């Protein structure tokens, strides 16, 4: 089985527009999810545990909101899958942190990208994370 795809920095730079589009769509769904959570919390405050009983007047609305939340959470996974299809590894969603395998000074590293960066300007070793990232000019 072949190993992971290794990217040149410029190849990842070319994917940033696609990453931003996926994340924008994710933001829209995140806002919907937040609204659903607010509605569910309000219903829970009004009805308490009775909300889960089919005899509760707002039970159907509650179930509908819960189903929609599950659907949106599934959509989050599909967004992560889309990023994976581009070769990225999602390391965080808020803020979005995405890594791509690369080579820096002969070492296997992650090119490290977060939202708002127009190009890959940072990297970190594969056993490190975002807080350990270095500017491209820095040596290991």
Describe each region flagged by the PLM.
Residues 35-73:
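Structured domain cores in non-transmembrane regions
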Residues 14-15, 34, 48, 91, ...:
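Residues in flexible loops and secondary-structure boundaries
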């Amino acid at each position: 089985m072949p190993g992971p795809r290794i990217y040149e920095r410029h190849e990842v730079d070319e994917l940033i527009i696609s990453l931003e589009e996926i994340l924008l769509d994710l933001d829209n769904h995140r806002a919907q999810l937040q609204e659903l959570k607010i509605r569910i919390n309000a219903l829970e405050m009004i009805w308490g545990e009775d909300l889960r009983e089919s005899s509760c007047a707002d039970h159907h609305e509650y179930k509908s909101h819960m189903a929609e939340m599950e659907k949106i959470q599934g959509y989050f996974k599909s967004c992560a899958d889309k990023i994976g299809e581009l070769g990225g590894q999602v390391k965080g969603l808020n803020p979005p942190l995405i890594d791509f395998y690369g080579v820096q000074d002969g070492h296997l590293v992650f090119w490290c990208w977060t939202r708002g960066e127009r190009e890959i300007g940072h990297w970190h070793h594969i056993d490190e994370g975002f807080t350990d990232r270095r500017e491209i000019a820095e040596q290991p």
